Amino acid sequence: AAELVGRFRNDRRALKSIALTTDTSILTSVGNDYGFDQIFSRQLQALGSPEDILIGISTSGNSRNILNAFKVASDLGITSIALTGKDGGIANKISDYSIVVDSESTARIQEAHILIGHILCEIIEEQLQFV
């Protein structure tokens, strides 16, 4: 989200983007009242609209909080992209698009996810003529 709101390579207009992982008040209140598996889906219900894109990151592809967010995204007509590892898990089956890092190593999967995030930012800037 930071590279989209701020910048990835060059100065440009800010792009609408939010990380659903950063508001500790929301995370703890939703986690306590609804369960940790609802921390992202509840936010998506409040903030999401059909023109949005949800990117969910799960090393295994089976994180319940990510899977629930993908289900809400589908209900709201939001395009979803899963970044996973191993065999892609359930996220690979229920997201609209999936990028699976073919590794069993959590560290390698997470490192690849960082690289993939930067590549996506570069593609977005190039496709939107921001470079």
Residue ranges and their predicted role:
Residues 1-130:
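Glycine-rich phosphate-binding loops that contact phosphosugars or nucleotide phosphates
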